[in-house]
Amino acid sequence: MNIELIVVGKTDMREVEALVSMYTKRLNHYVRFAITTIADVRNTKKLSESEQKRLEGEAILKLISESDHLMLLDEHGLELRSIEFADMLQRRMLSGTKRLVFVIGGPYGFSDAIYQRANSKLSLSKMTFSHQIVRAIFTEQLYRAFTILKNEPYHHE
């Protein structure tokens, strides 16, 4: 199975980029993992929130194939403990999913078209995090999930 994380906009926080890079390298030991960054929408001051979400959504949909399992990282998604997240990943792998795509939306969330296309939603917390910090949290949790599946001594209950 291939796993991809799609994010809107580049991060300007070197510390976040360093963490994401570190966990990406570690993850590639277990699974093919890639991050795709969609360029920020230009001239956002002239756009409504819904127009910005629509444009971001169009860019995201261009990267998704019909057979992909699309999971949105969304505040209204299912909350899982790390072990439950690992179990969900294992079920996806066993079900024959070829490409599992996670998406971190832009500052206003996702367009209706993205919500309609999504197969599921996952929440990392009831708290709100910046979209930049979510990249580091998510890649760490993904790495943690694979160490759980391999019974490696990273995760402690």
Placement of each model-derived feature along the sequence:
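Loop/turn-to-beta-strand initiation segments
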Residues: N2, T97-F102
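S-adenosyl-L-methionine/SAH cofactor-binding core of RNA-modifying enzymes
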Residues: R32-F33, T37-K98
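Short hydrophobic segments within beta-strands
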Residues: I6-V8, T36-I38, V103
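Proline/glycine-rich low-complexity loops and linkers
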Residues: G105-G106, R117
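N-terminal beta1-alpha1 ligand-phosphate binding loop
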Residues: M1-L27
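Conserved RecA-like P-loop NTPase ATPase core
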Residues: L5, M71, G105, F138
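Structured adenosyl-cofactor binding patch, chiefly the S-adenosyl-L-methionine
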Residues: D112-H156
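Short glycine-rich anion-binding loops that position phosphate/pyrophosphate groups of nucleotides
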Residues: T11, E75-L78, G106-G109
